[in-house]
Amino acid sequence: ALTFGIRMDTQKLSRGVCKMDMEMIWRMFDLCDQDMIYLLENSTLYFEDLMAYSKAISSIEVFENISFADTGRDCPEALIASVSDFMLALVEVSFSVVYSRKKEISVRSERPTLDAGKIISKALKGIGSGGGHATMAGGFVPFDGNDREEDLMIQNIRERFIDVISRTKRKSLR
């Protein structure tokens, strides 16, 4: 499980890898079931997973290089993160925010100057919580309102991300 988790979080050791990740992979190599890891890494999608991707694709909005996408209600956390990684495949996108209504927010960044963990922490300050690493982070905003209030909250969250990213970009130009 540890080996698979490290490989998933680092996109098969190609993103955000640290020395500890490599040491753990090396130590666990002979202890883990390589066939099981292959099966897990190459597993097929469930229909529900495909629907989450479909919802995200149909809802995506891109502002400069920032994408926002909605996977629908109660999407599993791992799938939200996977969709967020998928959104980074777009040429126009280098910072991705993907959320599941009433669930989680996943953030990914390909730009060294845009630290996903710091940005989500600042964007959600006072309304929720978030944090993580420079290239990937997650967060949550507790909410029990109706659909109209939820739409307003999502718009507020988008504006917060855009504001924090704009301020971060301006600081990096100094």
Segments predicted by a language model, with ranges:
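Alpha-helical scaffolds flanking conserved acidic
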Residues: 1-4
